[in-house]
Amino acid sequence: MSYSGEMIREVAANAEPEPAAQPEDLGRYFLERANAGDVEGLVALYEPGAVLAFPPGRLAAGHEEIRKVYAELLADKPSFGSAGQRLAIRNGDLALTSTRLPGGGATVEVARRQPDGSWRWVIDQPAVLPCGDQGNGSRSGSPHPRRAGPAARVDDR
């Protein structure tokens, strides 16, 4: 039996996204899926009750709200990059993940090991800027028209 290219693409489009075997996989999968415009693949990186602090100053809670945020964000087909991912800090079934952004700043996330051994984010703060930075942080390191609003800041204590 032979399959047409259209059938193969349809099966691939409906395939479940690969789960993160390690917490560090989440950042890599984010970049791959965001740059591919894969909203559902991005949503799969989060637990059903996860919280995403994006755009800055707003919270999206749960898959439905996170899906809306990423559908709007990816509508303009932005390009996402990273200046390097830090090793996750683990404590049992929790992990703190972080990625440095090309334009400065960083992302900070809390991931949790799932019953099947995979990892998903439960809290995502993708726009933490260095003190004194007045821009709107993002994973791409550059402002985006839909990313207006107060930027999250690292508290200097």
Each model region followed by its residue ranges:
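Surface-exposed, charged secondary-structure patches
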Residues: 22, 51, 56-58, 64-108, ...
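Structural motif
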Residues: 46, 90-91, 114-115
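Short beta-strand segments enriched in hydrophobic/aromatic residues
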Residues: 46-47, 101, 125
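Generic structural signal for secondary-structure transition and capping sites
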Residues: 39, 75-79, 116
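Short beta-strand edge/turn micro-motifs at domain boundaries
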Residues: 2-8, 106-137
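Residue-level recognition of short loop/turn positions
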Residues: 49, 56, 115-118
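Short, low-complexity N-terminal intrinsically disordered segments enriched in polar/charged residues
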Residues: 1-48, 131-157
